[in-house]
Amino acid sequence: MRPSRALIDLDALRHNIRLLNSIAHNARCAAVIKADAYGHGAVEIARALKGEAPKLAVACYDEAVSLREAGVTTPLLVLEGFYSSEELADSTRWCDIEWVVHDMEQLDMLSEVAPLRKAGPDSTRMQTWIKLNTGMNRLGLPLNKLAHVAEKLQQFPGLSVIGLMTHFACADELDSLLQQRQWRAFQAGMQAAGANGWSYSSANSAALLQYPETHLDWVRPGIAMYGASPMADKTGADFGLKPVMTFESRLIATRELQAGDSIGYGAAWTADAPTRMGVVAVGYGDGYPRQMQNGAPVAVCGKRTKIIGRVSMDMLTVDISHIPEARIGSEVELWGGTVSADEVAGYASTISYTLFTGMTSRVPRVYINRSEVV
């Protein structure tokens, strides 16, 4: 059996969400598990968060359906909203699906479906959040449309408007002028909304960690919940977070190189002295980035070392000159507790988000719960 695998530590996940809950103080957490929980496995993560997060957030309705069909009953916030009236109509078979309204055309779709929902208990009504564009200019309504959209939505007897939200573009930067402008714009939106009983949500992971004034009623932690940092100059450990994913494999060969010997495709690395190298059974076919630079950190037998040579589809090579105990079968950590995903990502000119979500189906996820493999 190929040795590459991703260990998903559900105890670390619970540690992180509890830490984030404590930072959020009185705000509640809508835990973001879109994109298969950032590559960690959405169903398993959702189950582990039961009792820890009162709401889960996904990108699209398909992700919501997968969770409901797996028996997950936690309320689900669909961040991209609905794409069609057909999606809306189909969603009537589920309870506690919360939609984001971010575009005027969505009102026409709602007008076809919302009247079919009768006024009743909150769990049976179609629930919506209004998204305000405060400067990211991706999704969201302008402030001057807020009153009109709110009035239209409230005309549907089977629909409840439950909140106003926005999304920050530069919350990972301290003293960002755009962050300040977006926050002021959202404050204006809250003031315009008035005393209507709505909830308010603006903080992603970065804002949760750096801008406490933005916490409001609901925070939406994503990457931080998985133990990585949204800030380029910090790691998850700097905030007391624990890595949830450990990506590991094993050595399948070792070799002694002489000065002048090169390794792999393109002869991208040449030894300038005698070097003992190891071949690891992992590559870009597993999601380890091909663009990873020479010198990227890994750990062999728990000791830090570096990649040498180009990453292949199924293999990569590492320097084990200073690890005499390394041999075929020795464990290799690509990222995890010894080598952080935040650090590794920098050597590929990317971010930890892409490392996690880019892991392919060839890599089995193995879950650890209460310190036991499940």
Curated annotation (Swiss-Prot):
Isomerase among keywords: yes
Binding site residues for substrate: R138, M313
Alphabetical list of PROSITE patterns matching this protein: ALANINE_RACEMASE
Cofactor(s) this protein requires: pyridoxal 5'-phosphate
GO molecular function terms noted in the UniProt entry: alanine racemase activity; pyridoxal phosphate binding
Keyword Nucleotide-binding listed: no
Active site annotation, chain numbering: K34, Y265
EC assignment: 5.1.1.1
InterPro entries in the cross-refs: Ala_racemase, Ala_racemase/Decarboxylase_C, Ala_racemase_C, Ala_racemase_N, Ala_racemase_pyridoxalP-BS, PLP-binding_barrel
SMART domains assigned: Ala_racemase_C
Reaction(s) catalysed (UniProt annotation): L-alanine = D-alanine
Domain of life the protein comes from: Bacteria
Pfam families cross-referenced by the UniProt entry: Ala_racemase_C (PF00842), Ala_racemase_N (PF01168)
Pathway(s) this gene product operates in, as recorded in its UniProt entry: Amino-acid biosynthesis; D-alanine biosynthesis; D-alanine from L-alanine: step 1/1
One record GO biological process: D-alanine biosynthetic process
GO cellular component, one term: cytosol
Alphabetically ordered keywords of this record: Isomerase, Pyridoxal phosphate
Residues modified as N6-(pyridoxal phosphate)lysine: K34
Family of the protein in this entry: Belongs to the alanine racemase family.
Primary role: Catalyzes the interconversion of L-alanine and D-alanine. May also act on other amino acids.
NCBIfam families found in the cross-reference section: alr
Name assigned to this protein: Alanine racemase
Biological source species: Hahella chejuensis (strain KCTC 2396)
